[in-house]
A protein has these predicted regions:
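TRNA-recognition modules of translation machinery and tRNA-sensing kinases, especially anticodon-binding
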Residues: 1-141
Length: 141
């Protein structure tokens, strides 16, 4: 995996266009000196999606990137939930093989083990929205 980062300040519409109501309500946003509506990034997904879309054909596939970005959300502070925090992200783009999902899960396990955690310290639960939707549709009908 290759490290990447993006700007901590992005155009406001990057987040308001497709983010959920909860994220939009937690934005630190303002108008800068150039009269542009901007926001401090609350999550990395829109930033990395913009970066990939802008130069996708120039990248060798699959693209395997990770980051530990600084993020900002205006939300009620509580234990473990700060307005400024860092978050580990790992993504594989340009590959639809389930082996990519397995690779990301293996990476997660390696990261947790690097913190001296063992199998007794964490549980990984897998789920599939499509599988649950299929199950629900077939049980109801």
């Amino acid at each position: 995996f290759q490290a990447y980062d993006g700007p901590p300040l992005e155009p406001l519409d990057l987040y308001t266009a497709k983010s959920g109501e909860e994220i939009v309500g937690q934005l630190y946003n303002f108008t800068d000196k150039g009269e542009r509506a901007v926001s401090m990034r609350p999550e990395m997904t829109p930033t990395v999606a913009r970066m990939i879309a802008a130069r996708e054909r120039h990248y060798k596939k699959p693209i395997k990137w990770y980051s530990i970005p600084q993020l900002f959300r205006y939300e009620r502070q509580q234990k473990g939930r700060l307005r400024e925090h860092f978050q580990f992200n790992a993504d594989i783009f340009g590959e639809n093989d389930p082996a990519s999902d397995a690779e990301l899960i293996a990476l997660l396990i390696d990261v947790l083990r690097s913190f001296d955690l063992s199998a007794e310290d964490f549980v990984i639960r897998l789920s599939s929205r499509n599988a649950w939707q299929y199950f629900a549709n077939n049980k109801i009908n």
